[in-house]
Amino acid sequence: HFVSAQVETALSVLFWLLAPAPADDAPAACVCAVPGNVHNIGPRILHHYLTTDGWKVLFLDGMTPLEDLVRLVGERRTRLVGLSVATDDQLPITVQSVATLRAMHRPPEAIFVGGPLIRSRPDLAGQIKADAAPGTAREARDLARQYQTAD
């Protein structure tokens, strides 16, 4: 985990130095590891992809409680939420997270799931009731483009 933390720090610093600031009216997205998932490199890469594609992206790690995730998504009027799932034991909290987000007064327009577990078992997206299960951050960015403009 030490090396992962160093990689994540390097990605964040480089991104901070090189990435353009999003426009004031940019659509909001939230990318996070589900509660209990400490693997943040994939979600961090998606955060960078979406930001450079014109989104205002809130990045949350797996230490963020579900209640805080829901509150922040609501406060920011988030259009898109991306959840990263690493292992089978995170499946129940992922299902709960999606259900809780969908029950919000203003739910996000789309909820994507990704990460190692979803990549190895894409059929889980239906069980989780996600809108999409992109296999890579690039694919997630491309799918997210349909939610960038308001209807």
Per-segment meaning from a language model:
Residues A26-L60:
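Glycine-rich active-site/cofactor-binding loop and its immediate structural neighborhood
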Residues Y49-T52, F59, T64-G126:
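Cofactor-cradling patches in redox/metallo enzymes
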Residues P116-D151:
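Peripheral docking tails and interdomain loops at the edges
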Residues P20-A23, E75-R77:
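Glycine-rich phosphate/diphosphate-binding loops that line cofactor/substrate pockets in enzymes
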Residues A19, D25-V31, V70, M104, ...:
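Hydrophobic/basic alpha-helical segments enriched in Actinobacteria
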